[in-house]
Amino acid sequence: MKRKLLIAVVLIVVIAGAYTVWCKFYRDVPQPQWIGADQRDEFLYGAVDTGEAQGIPYWIWLALPRLFPEYMPRPGGYASLGLSWEQTLEMPAGFAKKNVGYVRVTGNCALCHASSSSAGADGVPTVVAAPAGEITSMQLMLTFYRQCAEDPRFNASEILAEVDNAIKLSVVDKLIYRYVLIPRTKKALLNPERVIFTPELVAHAGNPQAEFSGQRLKKLADWMKTQRP
């Protein structure tokens, strides 16, 4: 009887643990319907599937400009990089917010193929999809992320303290960020193979109609990749 009870308890613990791991690292939650309902919005904000889990964990992405403002070109956070940004939205064009276990931010084609314009100084900026590409903003962003990762303050204690100003993470989520997501993100951002500007990518940015394979698209997104544990 005791043995059966012990086996039952072990099974419950194993199942609960497996379910927690699935929820925290692998559960795929669709993006909001408004993104897929419009081709323009899907291009600007839709997640690109390159066959691997990727992205900067959302709360790290949010904390970095606040923790390292000195590495931005000027005050203003990500907006200072010259990225195309619609005023009513949370993040610039070219960024996709995706929940695969944890919420992460990934890049898509609009990082290089979107621009904004406004009618007059007081006009509301309008983001246009797929014009001639521009990679200057992305180069500035890559430099920013690398400088952050090289800074000794890019550590769990500093980042979680900044995140705590925005949201109170659960104990489990704090442990995941401290021991998994923050170390893996730092390692990924410091890996030179994750920051790739091939001649083909630069040529494509100047001529968006040129052939651009899925493999090269994967390289474009590799700078913000973190592998699933």
Report each predicted region and the residues it spans.
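N-terminal Sec-pathway targeting helices
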Residues: 1-15, 19-22
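Acidic/proline-rich low-complexity IDRs
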Residues: 4-5, 10, 43, 63-66, ...
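Extracytoplasmic c-type cytochrome modules immediately beyond a signal peptide or single-pass transmembrane anchor
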Residues: 19-101, 216-228
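Extracytoplasmic redox metalloprotein regions
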Residues: 72-229
